[in-house]
Amino acid sequence: MAERTHACGKVTVEAVGQTVQLKGWVQKRRDLGGLIFIDLRDRTGIVQVVFNPETSKEALEVAETIRSEYVLHVEGTVVERGEGAINDNMATGRIEVQATKVNVLNAAKTTPIIIADDTDASEDVRLKYRYLDLRRPVMFNTFKMRHDVTKTIRNFLDTEEFLEVETPILTKSTPEGARDYLVPSRVHDGEFYALPQSPQLFKQLLMVGGFERYYQVARCFRDEDLRADRQPEFTQIDIEASFLTQDEILDMMERMMTKVMKDAKGVEVSAPFPRMKYADAMARYGSDKPDTRFEMELTDLSEFAAGCGFKVFTSAVESGGQVKAINAKGAASKYSRKDIDALTEFVKVYGAKGLAWLKVEEDGLKGPIAKFFGEEDANVLMTTLEATAGDLLLFVADKKSVVADSLGALRLRLGKELELIDESKFNFLWVTDWPLLEYDEDADRYFAAHHPFTMPFREDVELLETAPEKARAQAYDLVLNGYELGGGSLRIYERDVQEKMFKALGFSQEEAQEQFGFLLEAFEYGTPPHGGIALGLDRLVMLLAGRTNLRDTIAFPKTASASCLLTEAPSPVAEAQLEELNLKLSLKEEK
C-alpha cells in the first residue's frame, strides 16, 4: 500500500498536476450517469474525487460499489475545477482529484447516525455509537481545541518553572465533599481505596516536600447527582505554588488565560480581570458566578418595602427577609399575563412563593399590585429602579437566599429570552472574599464553602471558635460568562489553624486525627505558605468551542445517570471476582 502523500483537506491548487495518494472515508457519493463524484473525508477536511471512464474504467467499476463511510485509498491526479464548479466554501473547492486507482480498505454498514455537523441522532444514539459521533467534523474540532488549550497551558506553566507531577488515583476516602467512588482492596480485607475527588492533599504535601511549583492535568471522580455541566469523572488543571500571595496567583492565572484565549481561540482578552467580592456578586446578581455580559442587576428595595403599603413586602422585611427587583428594560410589551405566569412558576422552583410585577406605562404603573402604591411610593419605585415607560418590573420578597437564587436565575432567563447577551464576548471575573463556612440547617452543622484546607483571613482565625459564620476565606473563583471555571485559595499551613478549622466543622480530635493525621503531622515539619487553583478543563473547552453540553468535550462521557451507553458500564461482575475480594452483594428489593 502506497504511503499517503496528502491529507484530504490540504490538497490545494499548488498540487495541480501532481499524482496524490489519499486515504479517508466516503462522506458522500453522487452518480451523474457515467461519472461518479465522491467527497473523501479525513480529519483535515474534504476533497472531491472524480471517477471517469476515460481516466480509469477499473476505478469507476470499484466506485460503483462504494457507499458512505467506506474507507478508501485513492490514487489520482489533481486538476483545477471548471469555472462553474468552483466551491469557495471549501478549502479544496478550486480543485478535484481525477482517480486512476481506488482500493476499498474497509466497507461500512449504513450508519445509525448521519456523519455531519447537523446530525439528526438523539444524544443517547450518539453516545451508544460514540466512535461514529466522533467522526463528525464539529467533534474533531472540539477535541483539537481541547488539545490546543492543554498544550498552551502546559507550555505556559513550563515557562513559569512548574513541574508536572502525577498524584495517586487510589487514595484514602475522606468525609468532606461529594460521595467517593470506592475501590475494594483484595490485599486488605474489608478496606477500600477511594478515587480522588481532587489531588488537594497530595499537592499540598508536594509543597511540604519543597517542590514549590506543581501542576497536573488531573483526572477527578465524584459520585454526585449529575447536571448538564457535571460528569462523574472529569479533568481539571490542578496548580499549586509556595511563597506566592493571592495577587501573584491571580496575576499568573490571568496571564495564562489570556494566552489560552489568544492561542486556542484567537481572541484577545484584557487583563487584569475585574474582581468582585462574593457579597457584592450575590447582592448585585443573585449569583456567585455572575454573567456580566449584560446589565439587569438586582436592586434592594427592603428599606422602601418596610414602609410601603403592600403587606407582602412589609411582612417579608419584618421577618428578616428582603425585597429585591429587576427592571427588564423595554420588556413590558413582550410579556403577556400568561408569560408572566410562566415566570412565576419558574421562580417557584427556586423557593420563591410568587413573583410580583408591574408594567411601566406613560400614565404610571399598571399591574396587580399597582393599587398598593400611592403616587409618592410609585415615584420612589420609578426612581430607584430607573424605570421608564415600557419597562417590566419584577419583584421577589422572601428570605435573602431565596431572593438571590430566584431573581438570579430569572435574570439569566430574561437575558436569554430578550437576547441581551452578546455571545461573542468572553467576560472573565474573579469572585473573592468568600465565606469560609456555610451552615446546613438540616445537618445542624457547618460545612466548608470550598474545602476544609482553605486559609481564613488572618484577622478571622479566632472567629472559628466564636462566630464561625463571620469568618472569611482567602478564596477566589474564576468565572467566565456565568460559568465557574475553577476555584482556588491560599491554604492553611499551620497545625493549630487546621485543627481549629476541623473543630468548627464538627470533627472531634480523634476524627480529625484518623482522617487527616498525616497532614497534621506534615504541618509540623516546616510547611511553607502556599496556595493554588483548579480549573475545569472540560468546561473551559465547552465555552471556547461554543458547545452547550459538557459531554461534547469528553471523548467517552457518561450519561446523566452515570452510565456509558457504549460499553454498558457499570455492569455486574462475576461471583468469583466478588469472592476474591471477600465481598457479598446485598441489593435492595425493587418496590
UniProtKB/Swiss-Prot annotation:
EC numbers for this chain: 6.1.1.23
Region described as Aspartate: 200-203
Chain segments annotated as transmembrane: none
Keyword annotations: Aminoacyl-tRNA synthetase, ATP-binding, Cytoplasm, Ligase, Nucleotide-binding, Protein biosynthesis
GO cellular component: cytoplasm
Pfam families in the cross-refs: GAD, tRNA-synt_2, tRNA_anti-codon
NCBIfam families in alphabetical order: aspS_bact (TIGR00459), PRK00476.1 (NF001750)
This protein's name: Aspartate--tRNA(Asp/Asn) ligase
Lineage of source species: Bacteria, Bacillati, Bacillota, Bacilli, Bacillales
